[in-house]
């Protein structure tokens, strides 16, 4: 009996053990079933993901050509250094070695890697690496697991700073931008490493210039080092665009600006910057566009350093601004073209009427520079000598309402419509503007100031070019443009752009002929630019100007077209805090015209202190109960 009881207990123990073992095998079998069958696809994909990497291949951006087919902006092959993510923490020693080879800070590399959010895509660390550095990295490859070297197209600006605000710059898409783009469109073609246009034409035409990135699927070893290419999707280059810019004229304008700014600064004149635009008055095509100071877009293409960024961002002269389209300045004496047109057209004065300049106006104590009195003047002589007393009287006769109307005919206070981002509209002084902004009455003295391009009036250099083009071409207003053609992928034309007529100046030809004659005499002997153009072989019509600046020294203007009888080109120059227009902006315009017509220049003709270079003007005052102005006029005499 005891023996039977013992056998039953023994059997029970074996039964329990059997059931336990059986249960374990069942659990293992179920787990194996899950791994191999139910979740097999998931784990196979994960294994493949650890073994295979998709490497983005950046497409070459489209080329920007000048009007004659010369390359302005292109791409060139360059070595790039990337790190292939392994899912493991970075080795500090390896990071330090790579940083030393690339002359980077280790923390900058670590930040790039830590900020990376998109799985196993390579992380670009540095662009445009020299062959010497590439060779050294190859020699230390065993010490730098996961580091890869590729050849990619790098955006290249062969003329460096030339027309940098116009061309713009590019940069790699950031992690934040990429995440935002993928949220908006999960099928976006933008991926890690894609190069985007950031400013200027690069940004405006980014979708055309960018093209389509490709990629290659590579097999990597345990260290993340590529060992074989599995598949490849080829890139599709971006489309090319053709500009109206003439590279030779652009270079001449750039050189003229640099030389003149250097000369002015050497004379103690703190000229801060400049803007120059050359335009075909018969089409609106932009031939050259300079805004100084400039920046080097190659810095951004390679990956701008903190020091470089701080240098540009802290520059008080705003190198990123395209001052041709966004800089707003009092137009000064070139506005007398509009005042004179209005006075003649409204028959407020005849060309022959003589007005006596005693050095100041007889209604309000507004004076010429240094109290200079020019005596009896008709319209032609007043415009050629830029006499303010004469044009104060024209403002008095015409009135502010008519001045506003005629300024509108010439585009003052409205955008030109050029297809560039950031264009400013400027402003035309008026009682309505003063009431809206200051809630104050308008005074006659402000009409006088508006008549000579002061008061609240502001204009961009491009607006002044459009205004002068209307004068030069007989009264047609054209929309300025800088892109003449967009190509298909095969290089054939896709879109062609040309002259766009916006309107006709409602002023008779005989009136405009009188204005043009006055502008011609500006550059002749006795005119405010007579010394500047003495001996110049092309007959030039122009206008000097010195715009009062409430924040420092006066700005200098010069606007011109040539030849006088059959205009081919309009050139406008503005020198910030350059003082008298004839001596600051004038030489720039003269040199650009000389380059365009391929004629020599007599540099000795530039005499900034000669009598013919003076322009008469005054600031606001309180004579006859007139209220002082709130802005822009300084109250000091000024010259052209």
Short names for language-model regions:
Residues 1-304, 328, 401-411, 531, ...:
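Periplasmic/cell-envelope proteins involved in peptidoglycan metabolism and beta-lactam response
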Residues 2-5, 11, 73, 219-232, ...:
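Beta-lactam-recognizing serine transpeptidase/beta-lactamase-like catalytic domain environment
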């Amino acid at each position: 009996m005891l023996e039977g009881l013992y056998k039953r207990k023994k059997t029970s123990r074996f039964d329990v053990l059997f059931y336990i073992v059986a249960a374990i095998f069942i659990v293992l079998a179920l787990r194996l079933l899950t791994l191999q069958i139910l979740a097999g696809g998931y784990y196979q994909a994960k294994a493949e993901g650890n073994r295979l990497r998709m490497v983005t291949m950046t497409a070459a951006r489209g080329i920007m050509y000048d009007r004659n087919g010369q390359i302005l902006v292109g791409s060139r092959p360059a070595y790039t250094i990337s790190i292939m993510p392994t899912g493991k923490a970075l080795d500090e020693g390896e990071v330090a070695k790579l940083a030393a080879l690339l002359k980077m800070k280790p923390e900058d590399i670590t930040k790039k890697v830590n900020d990376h959010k998109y799985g196993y895509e390579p992380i670009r660390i540095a662009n445009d690496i020299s062959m010497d550095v590439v060779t050294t990295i190859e020699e230390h490859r065993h010490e730098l697991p996961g580091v890869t070297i590729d050849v990619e197209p790098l955006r290249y600006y062969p003329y460096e700073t030339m027309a940098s605000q116009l061309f713009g710059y590019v940069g790699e898409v950031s992690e934040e931008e990429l995440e935002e783009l993928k949220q908006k469109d999960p099928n976006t073609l933008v991926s890690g490493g894609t190069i985007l246009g950031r400013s200027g034409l690069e940004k405006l035409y980014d979708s055309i210039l960018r093209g389509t990135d490709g990629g290659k699927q590579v097999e990597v070893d345990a260290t993340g080092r590529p060992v074989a290419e599995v598949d490849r999707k080829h890139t599709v280059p971006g489309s090319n665009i053709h500009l109206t810019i003439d590279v030779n004229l652009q270079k001449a304008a750039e050189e003229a600006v640099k030389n003149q700014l250097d000369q002015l600064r050497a004379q103690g004149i703190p000229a801060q910057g400049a803007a120059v635009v050359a335009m075909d008055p018969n089409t609106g095509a932009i031939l050259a566009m300079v805004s100084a100071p400039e920046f080097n877009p190659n810095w951004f293409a390679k990956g701008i350093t903190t020091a470089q960024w701080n240098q540009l961002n802290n520059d008080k002269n705003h190198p990123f601004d395209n001052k041709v389209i966004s800089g707003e300045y009092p137009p000064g004496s070139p506005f007398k073209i509009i005042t004179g047109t209005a006075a003649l057209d409204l028959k407020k004065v005849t060309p022959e009427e003589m007005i006596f300049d005693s050095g100041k106006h007889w209604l309000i104590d507004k004076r010429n520079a240094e109290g200079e009195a020019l005596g009896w003047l008709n319209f032609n002589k007043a415009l050629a000598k830029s006499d303010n007393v004469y044009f104060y009287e024209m403002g008095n006769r015409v009135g502010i309402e008519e001045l506003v109307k005629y300024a509108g005919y010439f585009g003052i206070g409205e955008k030109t419509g050029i297809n560039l981002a950031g264009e400013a509209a400027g402003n035309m002084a008026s009682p309505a503007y003063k009431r809206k902004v200051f809630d104050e009455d308008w005074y006659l003295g402000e009409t006088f100031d508006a008549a000579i391009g002061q008061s609240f009036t502001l204009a961009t250099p491009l607006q002044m070019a459009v205004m002068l083009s209307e004068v030069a071409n007989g009264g047609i207003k054209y929309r300025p443009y800088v892109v003449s053609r967009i190509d298909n992928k095969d290089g054939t034309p896709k879109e062609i752009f040309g002259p766009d007529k916006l309107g006709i100046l409602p002023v008779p030809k005989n009136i405009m002929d009188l204005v043009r004659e006055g502008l011609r005499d500006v550059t002749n002997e006795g005119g405010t630019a007579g010394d500047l153009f003495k001996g110049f072989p092309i007959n030039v019509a122009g206008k000097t100007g010195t715009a009062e600046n409430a924040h420092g020294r006066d700005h200098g203007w010069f606007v011109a077209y040539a030849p006088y009888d059959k205009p081919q080109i309009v050139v406008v120059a503005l020198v910030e805090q350059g003082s008298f227009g004839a001596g600051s902006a004038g030489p720039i315009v003269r040199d650009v015209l000389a380059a365009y017509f391929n004629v020599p220049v007599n540099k000795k003709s530039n005499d900034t202190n000669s009598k013919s270079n003076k322009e008469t003007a005054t600031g606001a005052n309180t004579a006859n109960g007139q209220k002082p102005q709130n802005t822009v006029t300084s109250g000091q005499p000024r010259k052209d």
